[in-house]
Amino acid sequence: MPNIPTISLNDGRPFAEPGLGTYNLRGDEGVAAMVAAIDSGYRLLDTAVNYENESEVGRAVRASSVDRDELIVASKIPGRQHGRAEAVDSIRGSLDRLGLDVIDLQLIHWPNPSVGRWLDTWRGMIDAREAGLVRSIGVSNFTEPMLKTLIDETGVTPAVNQVELHPYFPQAALRAFHDEHGIRTESWSPLARRSELLTEQLLQELAVVYGVTPTQVVLRWHVQLGSTPIPKSADPDRQRENADVFGFALTADQVDAISGLERGRLWDGDPDTHEEM
């Protein structure tokens, strides 16, 4: 079993890396896949209202042999539930579906700027934290100006910003802002959706050098950037492969070379324009 380390967020709460992305893990098979991941050492399970599998995540937590206090369950508020009161109601709904007393990390899924209620939603999440419904609060797909607004208007800095991040889109400027403000970067689609990324010659060569797979090279790159990747997989062998990235270290030049593969987003997911309700 890989030894998956924990870190501390800016609110002092523990956080684990890597996490398990649970998108499309549904039904009994989804629950079994999540339990297998927990048994393999994963401690962070990432879900969302829009994934329509919060109940399965809760079932997996209860079915696992790991104490609830050792697990970190994260969920996300969808655009259709933005607003201060609406955010609290959304979180209560997630808790009901999860069958849990508290959510460890609550995120805003997308800012949905045309709706213009992400700041009020953030205030609602602060309310939920003060009410003991959630432990840590953060955001997903927020830009630097949006983060500045949250901090300036409320005095509360997000613990996490989960964003698209992979060697084709390393987000150096945003990561630097995160580091400056103590915001943990979390990477969705960390393997670029297993596009041609894993066939890149550089990654193939580094895999040979370290006796690992190209997937492990990429996930190790995330770790050394200071970002928590959340790859998704229902296959227990692949889950173990994805978690087993702490037995080697890339050089600084190798990290920079991987970042040099940059080409842009996988799709038109610009937070300034993208809407997801």
Curated annotation (Swiss-Prot):
Disulfide bonds: none annotated. The active site is at Y51 (proton donor). Transmembrane segments: none annotated. Gene3D superfamilies: NADP-dependent oxidoreductase domain. GO terms for molecular function: 2,5-didehydrogluconate reductase activity; aldo-keto reductase (NADPH) activity. SUPFAM superfamilies: NAD(P)-linked oxidoreductase. Keywords: Ascorbate biosynthesis, Cytoplasm, NADP, Oxidoreductase. GO terms for biological process: L-ascorbic acid biosynthetic process. It is found in: Cytoplasm. The keyword Methyltransferase does not apply. NADP(+) binds at residues 189-242. Substrate binds at H109. Its main location: cytoplasm. GO terms for cellular component: cytoplasm. Its EC number is 1.1.1.274. Belongs to the aldo/keto reductase family. This is 2,5-diketo-D-gluconic acid reductase B. It comes from Corynebacterium sp. (strain SHS752001).
